[in-house]
Amino acid sequence: MPPECGGPPMPLDPLTLRPLAPSETATYLAPAKVNLGLSVRGLRTDGYHELHSVMVPLVVGDELEIAAADTLTLRVEGAALPTDERNLVYRAARAYLDAAGVSGGATITLRKRLPLASGLGGGSSDAATTLMALARLFPAPVNLPALALTLGADVPFFLLGQAALAQGIGDVLTPLPVPQVPLVLVNPGVEVSARDAYAWLDEEEAFTPPLDVEGLLAALTAQHELPTFNALQGPVAARHAPIQAALAALSSAGLRSPLMSGSGATCFALAASDAQAHAAAQALQAQHPAWWVVATRTL
């Protein structure tokens, strides 16, 4: 849970926090996620894809600072993003304030630390964290999971605050006991539209069987290679050579199980220790100064 005002941002756990006084400002981490595996089973009759994915939150992410105010305003630092209803954070805040019957608003500062359109769930996490922060600031009997789903299929996962098996369109969540694991993230500077990624998959009809979740969890604990895959990786990497380069670089750095996260372009690989992760990240950044490289851990 986040510290009181003045401490470093931490993930938000709404179940353990006292309400905030109207005069208080709090800062929260909106954690990134990686998909330790992503199977796309097929296309549903409603036009969505049937997914089977292991999603894990990380200790790196965007930052949100939120305080009560007379009206709703959003400021964004670190990226050229809109600050009105075109921004998912703004829409999430507006949705909660309306559902809770709040007459006032909030001042929100979003500090973008994650690359845009990167497969790390940044926008969805920002939205979920906004919902939980406003629920702390303006407590009300609002169904947060239902509200989150109206904002995006990944948003409910970030309300959960832990690793989960995501099924359906990503909204059917089963918590998983994933150990803390050090890893390295690499984004080669490519933005990938999730819509495009799934369209390319559909063109190839490259649908996949379900993940071996038990085998994946056992391999994580034993620090073995993961029996996993990302169904989107082939179609996306075939069209974006920098993703192929990022995966090869992670493997050459001595890290295990390199994989693209979500629809890309961020790739990751697991390390045996924090020391190995940091050393590999430093080496990769030196070799590829234009890439975004981060050593981190699962939550």
UniProtKB/Swiss-Prot annotation:
Residues holding ATP: P115, L116, A117, S118, G119, L120, G121, G122, G123, S124, S125
GO biological process, one term: terpenoid biosynthetic process
Record EC number: 2.7.1.148
Enzyme class per UniProt: transferase
Pathway membership: Isoprenoid biosynthesis; isopentenyl diphosphate biosynthesis via DXP pathway; isopentenyl diphosphate from 1-deoxy-D-xylulose 5-phosphate: step 3/6
A GO term, aspect molecular function: ATP binding
Residue runs in coiled coils: none
Catalytic machinery residues: K33, D154
InterPro entries linked: GHMP_kinase_C_dom (IPR013750), GHMP_kinase_C_sf (IPR036554), GHMP_kinase_N_dom (IPR006204), IspE (IPR004424), Ribosomal_Su5_D2-typ_SF (IPR020568), Ribsml_uS5_D2-typ_fold_subgr (IPR014721)
Keyword set, alphabetical order: ATP-binding, Isoprene biosynthesis, Kinase, Nucleotide-binding, Transferase
Catalytic activity field: 4-CDP-2-C-methyl-D-erythritol + ATP = 4-CDP-2-C-methyl-D-erythritol 2-phosphate + ADP + H(+)
Pfam families referenced in this protein's UniProt entry, alphabetically: GHMP_kinases_C (PF08544), GHMP_kinases_N (PF00288)
Role according to the record: Catalyzes the phosphorylation of the position 2 hydroxy group of 4-diphosphocytidyl-2C-methyl-D-erythritol.
Record-linked HAMAP family: IspE
Family to which this protein belongs: Belongs to the GHMP kinase family. IspE subfamily.
Protein name: 4-diphosphocytidyl-2-C-methyl-D-erythritol kinase
This protein's encoding gene: ispE
